[in-house]
Amino acid sequence: MNNIDLRVYSFIDSLQPQLASYLATSSQGFLPVPGDACLWIEVAPGMAVHRLSDIALKATNVRLGEQVVERAFGSMEIHYRNQSDVLASGEAVLREINHAQEDRLPCRIAWKEIIRAITPDHATLINRQLRKGSMLLPGKSMFILETEPAGYIVQAANEAEKAAHVTLIDVRAFGNFGRLTMMGSEAETEEAMRAAEATIASINARARRAEGF
């Protein structure tokens, strides 16, 4: 499968409680639990993800939590308690498509912002949208982040939760852009933003060069 483009290869060593619970709520497959190791892979074209999911599942004991097949991109999420199983399945996928982790696309921050002292109207509107996380409370600060490709948003969310006392409102890792919404005090949301930015920088240190990134 030499014609497969590796867009996202994102390993998380230990899912944080809020993110794990969010993924379990939104998962169409086998739900993860806090502390699981997790690997998010995005490839193009989208249909290739079926074959890659099959290879990953047959390589070790990992479970498949998500698989989304779009025309342009395909995404899969695998997880397991033992990091070694997740990493071994990831290596099996990389061998199949003749790529290394460093061949993945870099992550571009398309938007980042902290909105302080959210108004009741704004909070209510966000809470009534199709979110699967906690409710946004008026008066709190809201951290929003958008990444391209979409799949990297999960790792950014995990590290932001690890670094700061913030509440996960929503995280969407499919389509052209990934979107993250978190809530907390002004200081905590600023810390979450710094952690997310540092995570993206570490991803880009081991990614291929691409125009516009």
Swiss-Prot record:
Homotrimer. Forms a dimer of stacked trimers, the same faces interact. Probably forms a CsoS1-CsoS1D-CsoS2 complex. Expression of 10 genes for alpha-carboxysome (Cb) proteins (cbbL-cbbS-csoS2-csoS3-csoS4A-csoS4B-csoS1C-csoS1A-csoS1B-csoS1D) in E.coli generates compartments that resemble Cb, contain RuBisCO and have its catalytic activity, showing it is possible to make artificial, functional Cb using these 10 genes. Cargo proteins can be targeted to these organelles. Artificial Cb assembly in E.coli requires csoS2-csoS4A-csoS4B-csoS1C-csoS1A-csoS1B-csoS1D (but not the gene for carbonic anhydrase, csoS3). Gene3D superfamilies: 3.30.70.1710. Belongs to the EutL/PduB family. This is Carboxysome shell protein CsoS1D. GO terms for cellular component: carboxysome. The gene is csoS1D. Keywords: Bacterial microcompartment, Carbon dioxide fixation, Carboxysome, Repeat. It is found in: Carboxysome.
